[in-house]
């Protein structure tokens, strides 16, 4: 494993002009968040300023699903992935990308894009949102099993990013959903794919949870300790230890989470090698990203732990980026 000193950012978004146009044509971001201005140069500036050597780009929610028409959503996904591949090809050791997909509710379209993006464009993984559709189709829903099978067959890296809940009413006008609700959406879908057996069935998938797993490390044992002893536990048959084992199987990025309180818990919870650096640029304010990065850089890790989280763990997950010794 390389000891390359620069950070490897697995949570970094791009916002091409054609996506901004799609958002604006469909009423804006349903989460209530402001659409940021983005250029490749702005990403490179952030990378230089906080010491990022490699970035995996992804399109955040709502992604291609902003189009309700399935053909328009499929077209936007294809355009996004073609754009991302061109950025990657401009500097393959500096950039990678997670493929954007149409809504998983349009199964054939989503599977087609998985095959094209991974098999033809050589995407580094795919982005899945925490839920799809007008109801609670979280990622453990039976309708998504064929999609998970496609990903499992390819040993895909699956980057799980939160999206807005069914209820888009805000807690307060000053608290848009990405600020406070998104981590809970991540926890919901993570527990759903555990209790539905999805994690155990599709073991080849390497699943990254955004934002240090939301509240999963804090709440996993609450579910695990009670579930086997309730009527609800009969449907999955998982023991307390099995639920925790599956919860620990995830990878966790540190986007907006590199602080002493979150790190203190996550280092105890996550498996060795499963914590990754993330920035959440450009949706997070640059000052916020700098704050969390500085907090992370000041945290009292061993040098080996710091090097692993900064880059080594990501290089193990994405071997094409490993730097020759």
From Swiss-Prot:
Keyword Zinc carried by entry: yes
Keyword tags: Decarboxylase, Lyase, Metal-binding, Zinc
SUPFAM superfamilies linked to this entry: Metallo-dependent hydrolases (SSF51556)
GO biological process: secondary metabolic process; terpenoid biosynthetic process
InterPro entries: ACMSD, Amidohydro-rel, Metal_Hydrolase
EC number: 4.1.1.52
This protein's pathway: Secondary metabolite biosynthesis; terpenoid biosynthesis
Phenotype on disruption: Abolishes the production of arthrobotrisins A to D and arthrosporol A, and accumulates 6-methylsalicylic acid. Leads to altered growth rates and the development of much more fluffy aerial hypha. Shows significantly increased ammonia levels in fungal mycelia.
Induction: Expression is down-regulated by the cluster-specific transcription factor AOL_s00215g275. Expression is also down-regulated by the HOG1-MAPK pathway downstream transcription factor MSN2.
Family named by the database record: Belongs to the metallo-dependent hydrolases superfamily. ACMSD family.
Function according to Swiss-Prot or TrEMBL: 6-methylsalicylic acid decarboxylase; part of the gene cluster that mediates the biosynthesis of sesquiterpenyl epoxy-cyclohexenoids (SECs) such as anthrobotrisins and arthrosporols, metabolites that possess a novel hybrid carbon skeleton consisting of a polyketide-derived epoxycyclohexenol combined with a terpenoid-derived monocyclic sesquiterpenol substructure (PKS-PTS hybrid). The SEC pathway plays an important role for fungal soil colonization via decreasing fungal nematode-capturing ability.
Oligomer status and interactors: Monomer.
Protein name stated in the entry: 6-methylsalicylic acid decarboxylase
């Amino acid at each position: 494993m390389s000891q390359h000193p620069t950070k490897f950012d697995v949570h970094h978004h791009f916002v091409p002009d054609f996506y901004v146009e799609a958002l604006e044509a469909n009423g804006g971001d349903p989460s209530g968040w402001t659409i940021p201005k983005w250029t490749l140069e702005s990403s490179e500036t952030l990378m230089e300023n906080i010491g990022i050597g490699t970035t995996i780009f992804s399109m955040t929610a709502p992604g291609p699903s902003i189009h309700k028409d399935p053909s328009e959503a499929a077209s936007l996904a294809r355009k996004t992935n073609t754009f991302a591949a061109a950025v990657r090809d401009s500097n393959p050791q500096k950039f990678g990308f997670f493929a954007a997909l149409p809504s998983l509710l349009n199964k054939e379209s989503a599977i087609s894009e998985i095959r094209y993006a991974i098999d033809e464009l050589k995407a580094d993984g795919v982005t899945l949102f925490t839920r799809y559709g007008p109801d609670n189709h979280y990622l453990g829903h039976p309708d998504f099993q064929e999609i998970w099978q496609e990903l499992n067959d390819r040993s895909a890296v699956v980057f799980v990013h939160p999206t807005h809940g069914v209820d888009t009413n805000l807690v307060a006008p000053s608290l848009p959903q990405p600020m406070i609700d998104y981590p809970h959406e991540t926890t919901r879908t993570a527990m759903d794919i555990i209790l539905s057996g999805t994690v155990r069935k599709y073991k080849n998938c390497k699943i990254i949870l955004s934002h240090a797993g939301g509240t999963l490390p804090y709440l996993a044992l609450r579910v695990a300790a009670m579930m086997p002893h309730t009527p609800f536990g009969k449907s999955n048959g998982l023991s307390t230890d099995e639920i925790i084992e599956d919860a620990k199987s995830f990878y966790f990025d540190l986007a907006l989470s590199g602080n002493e309180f979150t790190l203190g818990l996550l280092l105890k919870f996550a498996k060795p090698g499963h914590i990754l650096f993330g920035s959440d640029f450009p949706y997070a304010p640059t000052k916020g990203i700098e704050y969390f990065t500085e907090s992370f850089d000041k945290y009292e890790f061993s040098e080996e732990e710091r090097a692993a989280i900064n880059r080594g763990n990501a290089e193990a997950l994405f071997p094409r980026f490993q730097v020759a010794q």
